[in-house]
Amino acid sequence: MEREDDSIFLFHAPCENCGSSDGNSVYSDGHEWCFVCEHRVPANEEREAKLSTRRRTGGSKPMSYDVWNFGDSNGRYSDLTARGISKETCQKAGYWLAKVDNRMYQVADYRDQNGSIVSQKVRDKDKNFKTTGSHKSDALFLKHLWSGGKKIVVTEGEIDALTVMELQDCKYPVVSLGHGASAAKKTCAANYEYFDQFEQIILMFDMDDAGRKAVEEAAQVLPAGKVRVAVLPCKDANECHIMGEDKAILEQVWNANPWVPDGVVSALSLKDRVKEAMTSEDAVGLLFDGCQGLNDRTLGARGGEVVMVTSGSGMGKSTFVRQQALAWGKRMGKRVGLAMLEESVEDTIQDMMGLNNKVRLRQSDEVKKAIAEDGRFDEWYDELFGDDTFHLYDSFAEAEADRLLAKLAYMRTGLGCDVIVLDHISIVVSASEESDERKMIDRLMTKLKGFAKSTGVVLVVICHLKNPEKGKAHEEGRAVSITDLRGSGALRQLSDTIIALERNQQGDMPNLVLVRLLKCRFTGDTGIAGYMEYNRETGWLEPSSYTGGEGEGDTGWTEQDGQSDF
């Protein structure tokens, strides 16, 4: 019985007695207990040895062979007397003592959400650290114990996390950074969705320069409005505990102040900065490709703006935004995020490669086969994507709103994307179970606008048009009005710039596109910005010298081939 008291819970597994899929609990010494039928399997050395390779339900991988085995390493749980941490807390957390080659070590087990050990941090008496297993950049100690709630405390190291755990009787969420303060931003960004499950995120980092720097870096990539910062009277949580300042720690857990970013400054000190900003290229914004008139009317797209692109079905919206993304990423050196929800990432990549090499790659099996065989594929791919400028949302046809927003936020705060393209907003709304589409769009647009404004990203969003009640369709050259946007008034109210593409698919010049500016909050300008023409050989929307009259997109155009290829 003493042996089982020292064991720790590892994971849930099927019960061989009652058939429950996950009611059975497996422990580190090999014994099992089913909470459904109360069937107990006793521990033995053979069963314990098999635990390191036992597969979990759902086909997940076994424990890594290169992590330290509790038995082989003469492992034991013990009070950390010098740190004021009990054996019970260490057992709950998976923090144990090992004796290898007559040397003592402290071992922190890092587990995945299923409870399997994936890596460990090992520390010797001289405070030298090393890791075992697959210790990835998103590693958080104790993450497997918690899955949402009101508060979660984040500390720099395992000992501080154990301290907070000790003071709260192991009942409330606390984790520590797997790679310390220097990697706080990267670790927190990689765990954005995990932290977003909690209402408050309390950063209880060390009270030194490195800790304060880590707070500022980490807070910026965590969910907005949720971050709070703990201020302690000693260097860290464990030192407070040792010095009898437990009350100060708990006070910060429950009453830490919200994080307020740096940036409140006197206007008197901004004179030189404002002058420089007025004369910099950034003041013009990111210029649009292929239509100079659009740049003349908008002066480009600025950080924090929502740019809406709309047209009838099959009119060139996706081609237009892909072309802009390529120009911004390749020519201007901006980082670009692409959430193209109507197509797979493989299709998006092929279209971007085709545009960059002026060939309609995805539509030509002959060209695809040729470049794969003659080596051009690697050349084209590396030339466009080798500098890691483009990042894609890889969830074809999966667009649940909150999950999507978390991914977009990671593109901006974690990957540093300057521009994000969302194609299209209608598919996000249709993925919701909510019946009121108008209210859904209102909320989604409010979140998108807040996201763009708070992070400074240029957010390009595609939306569809509603079908006109009478008269010709938009696909037949009907002029687009700002009230034609399908869904809610929030689409036009919260967008900074709205660009409409018009063409007559059945007219004499079906590949000629009229570019109409419906709104520009920055300049106040509206009207026809110019014309672009689709090149069937290169896949590009190119500048056109056509100057037809407004509302007469199919009048006076000379017939070419009567075919449309958007």
UniProtKB/Swiss-Prot annotation:
Any one Gene Ontology molecular-function term assigned to this protein's record: 5'-3' DNA helicase activity
Keywords: ATP-binding, DNA replication, DNA-binding, DNA-directed RNA polymerase, Helicase, Hydrolase, Late protein, Magnesium, Metal-binding, Multifunctional enzyme, Nucleotide-binding, Nucleotidyltransferase, Primosome, Transcription, Transferase, Viral DNA replication, Zinc, Zinc-finger
Co-factor requirement: Mg(2+)
EC number: 2.7.7.-, 3.6.4.12
Zn finger (C4-like) start-end: 15-37
List of residues binding Mg(2+) 2: D236
Domain SF4 helicase span(s) in chain numbering: 280-547
Annotated region (Disordered), positions in chain: 542-566
One GO biological process term: viral DNA genome replication
Biased composition (Low complexity): 555-566
PROSITE patterns given in the database record: SF4_HELICASE (PS51199), TOPRIM (PS50880)
Keyword check for Iron: no
Domain Toprim: 150-237
Function: ATP-dependent DNA helicase and primase essential for viral DNA replication and recombination. The helicase moves 5' -> 3' on the lagging strand template, unwinding the DNA duplex ahead of the leading strand polymerase at the replication fork and generating ssDNA for both leading and lagging strand synthesis. ATP or dTTP hydrolysis propels each helicase domain to translocate sequentially along DNA. Mediates strand transfer when a joint molecule is available and participates in recombinational DNA repair through its role in strand exchange.
Quaternary context: Homohexamer. Assembles as a hexamer onto linear or circular ssDNA in the presence of ATP or dTTP. Interacts (via C-terminus) with the viral DNA polymerase that is bound to DNA; this interaction is essential to initiate leading-strand DNA synthesis. The priming complex consists of 2 DNA polymerases and 1 helicase-primase hexamer that assemble on the DNA template. Interacts with the single-stranded DNA-binding protein. Part of the replicase complex that includes the DNA polymerase, the primase/helicase and the single-stranded DNA binding protein.
Protein name: DNA helicase/primase
Organism (species): Enterobacteria phage T3 (Bacteriophage T3)
